């Protein structure tokens, strides 16, 4: 998960009991061995339709493992915080934000999928207490990591509030660490960082003004308005255009095997010099830090993928809208950014790419208010028509405007510039992901790289290439042709029988395996032909019911995870009992043939 990368261990040390402190919790609290139960009494309540972000994440919760969806983070604790102070601050946090008190009762359908959200005005929450014993600071950090990894794998009860779980690491009544696990239907990554800001103020005794951001109920009403529905419809058209014409698999290269890797390598890079260079590039190109970093990331990714065009998924996309920047909830909808990276000519440079990135990212962000059910159906429909299924391989998540600098400043000072720190592997099904954590004063980002595409040494080269490119671009326009020398990265290879078909690089051996595996024993032999960008599958069978439509349906159903293959454009079905020599296929009469796509097969 990305949750651990949000806080990045910004712990504040405590070594003694606070002077004059009394550890008395205010009200509605019971404590048993290792567990505190307290009540919250929030303002407001009610029910309404789901927000589009809630709907999206509830579908993901029903499909994916808890550790892929829940969010774990370790929050900084102000020095001298007692258990009583912490519990009261957490109570105030729950009472302050409706999203944390929102539940999702089962809907009337057969699958029970929720159709509405309900905000609980009051209820109970629990706080686990774990003594740190004689551990030092590093040992406490390790314990916090261990507890977070265990808790993040536990699913949330969607019918019960709150949407957060809390664990305090304590020495007597003094709190050393706060481990928080969040349900992604209640909070996204940016919301977590905003909650950390509130927590720090509340734990320090501050009185906060009422929350001024839109509540999930208010957001849902806006999304269901005529204006909201028009925006959603426009977003769907944008997605259809990109899914139909853009690359379905940006990292279609040697080494890609069906299915995702067990773990995705993760590292954290910090550099003050790179932040100064980034600022210089922004001044010179009149672009913001997000656009510049996205352009650099895209240029390096395209170089590694040995292609000139990419489709990038940007998380927290709706956070780019000022009205939702401080929303506490889950927006959790992707922006789909189709980018011509280049180089389109020998003199194409990073400045020009930054300009293209600004336009492409604005278009993607503007069209990121999505109905998840319709988007998933669109993905299926395009896969059926195109024969290639979109894979979210390259991802960017810009959290830099939301993470308080105090979280970064609380870490130990870097020992080098740039400093690279390896993090625990993450269970994320991506090929390459950039999490931008900070841009002002220090450039800080977390890079996740799939081992099928990047060995660990290459992942580190990629990360170190970002400040190298910024340093070169700070001095003036940087030709894209110089990326190879700057990065030290070699482009990925495509050995064997690869063909460029539309926007995709396709491994014909993978297509043959796809068709054979999809049909199984229904096919006695399979042959694949390629001519003028079209793939034709010839299938020998004794199955009288096997038609082009049935074959195509089976092949498309087997596509997920096979990112180097696509379904053939045309199928010819031959009735024949056994294997056939290659020279026999052209003379064999076809029983039926056609595209298999929502059109009648031509019977022979």
Regions found by a protein language model. Give the residues of each.
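Gly/Ser/Thr-rich phosphate-binding loops and adjoining beta-strand/alpha-helix segments
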Residues: 38-41, 47, 66-85, 158-179, ...
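A short, small/polar-residue-rich loop/turn motif at beta-strand boundaries
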Residues: 3, 8, 31-45, 79-95, ...
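Short amphipathic alpha-helices and their capping loops
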Residues: 2-64, 88-135, 162, 214-263
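Active-site-proximal acidic secondary-structure segment that organizes catalysis
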Residues: 27, 41, 47-48, 130, ...
């Amino acid at each position: 998960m990305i949750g651990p990368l949000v806080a990045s261990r910004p712990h504040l040390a405590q070594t003694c009991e606070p002077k004059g402190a009394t550890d008395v919790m205010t009200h509605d609290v019971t404590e048993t061995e290792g567990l505190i139960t307290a009540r919250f009494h929030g303002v407001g309540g009610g029910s309404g339709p789901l927000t589009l972000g809630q709907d999206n994440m509830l579908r993901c919760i029903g499909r994916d493992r808890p550790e892929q969806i829940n969010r774990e983070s370790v929050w900084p604790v102000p020095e001298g915080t007692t258990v009583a102070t912490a519990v009261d601050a957490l109570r105030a946090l729950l009472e302050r934000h409706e999203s944390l008190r929102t539940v999702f009762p089962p809907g009337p359908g057969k699958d029970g999928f929720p159709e509405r959200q309900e905000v609980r005005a009051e209820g109970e929450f629990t706080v686990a207490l774990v003594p740190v014993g004689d551990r030092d600071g590093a040992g406490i950090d390790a314990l916090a990591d261990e507890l977070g990894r265990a808790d993040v794998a536990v699913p949330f009860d969607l019918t019960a509030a709150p949407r957060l779980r809390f664990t305090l690491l304590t020495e007597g009544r003094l709190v050393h660490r706060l481990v928080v696990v969040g349900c992604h239907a209640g909070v996204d990554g940016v919301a977590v960082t905003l909650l950390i800001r509130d927590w720090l103020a509340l734990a320090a005794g501050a009185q906060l003004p009422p929350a001024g951001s839109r509540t999930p109920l208010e957001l849902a009403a806006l999304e269901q308005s005529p204006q909201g529905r028009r925006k959603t419809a426009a977003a769907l058209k944008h997605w259809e255009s990109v899914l139909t014409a853009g690359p379905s698999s940006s990292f279609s290269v040697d080494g890609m095997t069906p299915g995702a890797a067990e773990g995705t390598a993760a590292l954290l890079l910090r550099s003050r010099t790179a932040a100064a260079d980034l600022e210089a590039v922004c001044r010179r190109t009149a672009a913001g830090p997000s656009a510049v970093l996205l352009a650099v990331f895209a240029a390096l990714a395209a170089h590694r993928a040995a292609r000139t065009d990419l489709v990038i998924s940007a998380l927290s996309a709706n956070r780019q809208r000022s009205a939702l920047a401080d929303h506490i909830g889950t927006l959790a909808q992707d922006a789909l950014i189709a980018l011509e990276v280049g180089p389109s000519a020998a003199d194409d440079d990073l400045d020009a790419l930054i300009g293209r990135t600004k336009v492409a990212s604005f278009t993607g962000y503007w069209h990121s208010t999505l109905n998840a059910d319709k988007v998933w159906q669109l993905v299926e429909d395009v896969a059926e028509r195109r024969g290639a299924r979109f894979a979210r391989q390259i991802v960017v998540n810009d959290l830099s405007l939301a993470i308080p600098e105090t979280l970064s400043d609380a870490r130990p000072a870097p020992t080098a510039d740039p400093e690279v720190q390896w993090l625990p592997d993450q269970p994320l099904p991506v090929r390459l992901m950039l999490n931008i954590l900070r841009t002002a004063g220090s450039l800080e980002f977390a890079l996740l790289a799939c081992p099928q595409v990047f060995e660990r040494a290459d992942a580190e080269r990629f990360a170190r290439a970002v400040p190298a490119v910024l340093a070169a671009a700070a001095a003036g326009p940087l030709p894209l042709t110089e990326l190879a020398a700057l990065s030290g990265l070699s482009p990925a290879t495509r050995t064997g029988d690869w063909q460029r078909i539309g926007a995709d690089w396709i491994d014909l051996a993978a297509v043959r395996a796809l068709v054979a595996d999809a049909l199984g024993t229904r096919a006695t032999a399979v042959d694949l032909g390629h001519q003028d960008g079209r793939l034709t599958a010839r299938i020998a069978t004794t199955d009288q019911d096997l038609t082009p439509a049935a074959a195509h349906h089976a092949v498309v159903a087997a596509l997920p995870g096979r990112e180097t293959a696509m379904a053939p454009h045309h199928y010819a079905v031959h009735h024949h009992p056994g294997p056939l020599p290659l020279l026999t296929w052209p003379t064999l009469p076809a029983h039926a043939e056609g595209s298999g796509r929502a059109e009648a097969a031509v019977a022979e």
